[in-house]
Amino acid sequence: MRQGSYLTLTLLLLIFGSAAVEAGPDYQLEIRDASNQLITHFPLQHGHWCLHWRHSVTGIAVEDCYRTEAGQMQLSHSWQPDFAAGLGHFEGRGTLVSHPQGGYLIESINEPVPGNGLWIRVGSESVAHTLISADTHLNLSQLAAGQRLRLQLISTKH
C-alpha cells in the first residue's frame, strides 16, 4: 500500500472512529410521571447507573446500582451502611460482605428488573433521590419531590 493510501485510511479511521465515540451511550433511562408524561431522559454510560438517596427515617445514605446485560436492566449491587427499616439482605439474593467505607454491600444480586423499568416514589430534597452514571448526576428530588416516577430502560440504537 502506498504512503498516500495509509494517510487516507488513517484519516478515515480518525473521522469515523471519533464519530462513533461521540455518538453517545447505547442506553438511557426515560423518566415519566404517573400520568405517563415524559419528564426527561438520563443517559447511561456503559449501561451502568446508580440510584442514591438518604433513608427517610434514619437519614443514612443508600445506593442501589444497576447494569444493562443483553438489553435487560439488572439490579447489580446495593450498599447499605445500616439495615434500617425496609433494608437488608435476603438469603439467596446476592452475597453479603462488609463495605470498605462501612456498612454492608450486597454484591452479585444480578436480579432482572421486570419490564426493564421500575417505579419510585421520589422523596423530599432531604432524601435526595439522585441518579448517577459516570460523571452525570440528576437529582430527582429537586425535579419531582413527592411524585411517583417510572424509570424505564430505553435503547438509543436505531
Language model features with spans:
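Bacterial N-terminal signal peptides that target proteins for export
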Residues: M1-T8
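Bacterial N-terminal signal peptides
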Residues: T8-F16
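Boundary at the C-terminal end of the N-terminal hydrophobic targeting segment
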Residues: A20-P25
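N-terminal secretory signal peptides
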Residues: D26-H89
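Mature, soluble, non-transmembrane domains
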Residues: M73-S76, G86-H158
